[in-house]
Amino acid sequence: MAVFVANESGVTDFDEVTLAALARFVLDTMKVNPLAELSVMLVEIDAMTDLHVRYMAEEGPTDVLAFPQDEAFEPSWSESPEEDPTTLLGDVVLCPEVARRQAAQAGHGMERELHILCTHGILHLLGYDHAEPEEEREMWKLQNSLLASWDTAAGTGAS
């Protein structure tokens, strides 16, 4: 499972290695093809605002955007991964400045918020959405479960 993290935000008070490990954990837990590749980009607020306007037609910055690459992506993989071609899952774009504000409002640290947002973005790449109330309940439940499992596996608590 290849996870590439590119920090173009200028923000450095979080652990990029841990963020990549979280992403791999989520992908593994969701039984994504082990040959899949994921890009996680962290961008400054102006870049996120531009992406939000350009791709979502919504003004202002947002916290996370997900850009799937392979439309035919299947979240499960065969027992013989060598039979599965490498899959470009997509890009998750995070904005640490927005994450910092949201973290303060939620009463936890920015790194925790980035973990929440990264998990959220990956779920979008896997086809989950929250446009309808039932979809939202399912996605949030799964997101919370994945983060709780990560906390246990990584030996961390929500911070």
UniProtKB/Swiss-Prot annotation:
Keywords: Cytoplasm, Endonuclease, Hydrolase, Metal-binding, Nuclease, Ribosome biogenesis, rRNA processing, Zinc. Belongs to the endoribonuclease YbeY family. GO terms for molecular function: metalloendopeptidase activity; RNA endonuclease activity; zinc ion binding. This is Endoribonuclease YbeY. Its EC number is 3.1.-.-. PANTHER family: ENDORIBONUCLEASE YBEY, CHLOROPLASTIC. It holds the Pfam family YbeY. Its cofactor is Zn(2+). Single strand-specific metallo-endoribonuclease involved in late-stage 70S ribosome quality control and in maturation of the 3' terminus of the 16S rRNA. Gene3D superfamilies: Metalloproteases ('zincins'), catalytic domain. Binds 1 zinc ion. Zn(2+) binds at residues 120, 124, 130. One of its GO terms (biological process) is rRNA processing. It is found in: Cytoplasm. It comes from Parafrankia sp. (strain EAN1pec). NCBIfam families: rRNA maturation RNase YbeY. One of its GO terms (cellular component) is cytoplasm.
